[in-house]
A protein has these predicted regions:
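ATP-binding/phosphotransfer module of carbohydrate and carboxylate kinases, centering on a glycine-rich
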Residues: 1-66, 74-78, 96-104, 118-133, ...
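A charged helix-plus-loop insertion that forms the helical arch/lid used to bind
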Residues: 79-91
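General beta-strand structural signal in soluble alpha/beta enzymes
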Residues: 106-111
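Short acidic loop-to-helix transition motifs that present clustered carboxylates
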Residues: 113-117
Length: 258
């Protein structure tokens, strides 16, 4: 891993955030910049905002790759889905779009995958050498799987069918808010979700991210699982940090899964 700060950018449905990351420390090297996501979040419009963020940090970063997260399945630089962003992203050559717009190397990754990498490299699962499964509970459910520190990308475990339903329509944090559930009422939905995921993968550790992770003490002790489960440590910094780490790792280890 290089010593110069690396730029990580996190594209979300409402905001696009970027920060320089110190990969030796596993944290931001300078304050984060946030720009609202364009109301029409097409690839061209989003790339323009990303270019603004890059310009802001250009004189403080090296000439290495930029890591960018996006709420989509990403295979070989192509976005295969689109969650909370314009549907024109589906099957778009997104990594090339960003690289062409910025005039530099870009590594594009799924947002939950980036967060999971950050938690294993620097956060709640730091240096864990087993099977770590991270879920982010938000508008939907994102997921990341890492085995011995290596990412297995695009797991999309929010879309498991459980009891006839797409899992995230029953257990995402947005459902708790929509239905006005207390944590005591919500925990049963989480129990069902995690016990199914546990039976499929038998991970060594669950890490839970998303806004509800700050209230982990209100629901985690009530979950009856065989797998240890812990809240994420990096919170809303994880995506940016993970993107920066993956950008450098992709250059150093091009054989990793894409």
């Amino acid at each position: 891993m290089q010593n110069q700060p690396v730029l990580g950018i996190d594209i979300g449905g409402s905001g696009i955030k970027g920060a320089l990351v110190d990969l030796a420390a596993g944290d931001f090297a300078a304050p984060r910049l946030r720009i609202p996501t364009p109301s029409k979040s097409t690839p061209a419009n989003v790339a323009d905002v990303v270019a603004e963020i890059v310009a802001e940090f250009a004189d403080k970063m090296g000439d290495g790759p930029i890591g960018i997260t996006i709420p989509a399945v990403v295979t070989h630089g192509i976005t295969r889905s689109a969650a909370n962003i314009d549907k024109s992203w589906i099957d778009a050559p997104a990594e090339k779009i960003f690289s062409d717009r910025l005039g530099r190397s870009v590594v594009l990754v799924n947002d939950a995958d980036a967060a999971g990498v950050a938690e294993v490299k620097f956060g709640a699962a730091r240096d864990h050498q087993g099977l770590v499964l991270m879920t982010t509970l938000g508008t939907g459910i994102g997921s990341a799987i890492l085995y011995r520190g290596v990412l297995i990308p695009n797991s999309e475990l929010g879309h498991l069918e459980i009891d006839g339903h797409d899992a995230e329509t029953q257990a995402a944090a947005s459902i708790k808010t929509l239905l006005g559930l207390s944590y005591s009422e919500y925990v049963g939905r989480l129990q069902r979700y995690y016990e199914v995921v546990e039976a499929l993968f038998w991970p060594d550790l669950f890490v839970v991210g998303g806004g509800v992770s700050k209230d982990a003490d209100k629901f985690m002790p009530k979950l009856k699982l065989k797998t240890p489960i812990v809240p994420a440590a990096l919170r809303n910094r994880a995506g940016i940090i993970g993107a920066a780490w993956l950008a450098v790792d992709k250059v150093e280890h091009p054989e990793r899964p894409a």
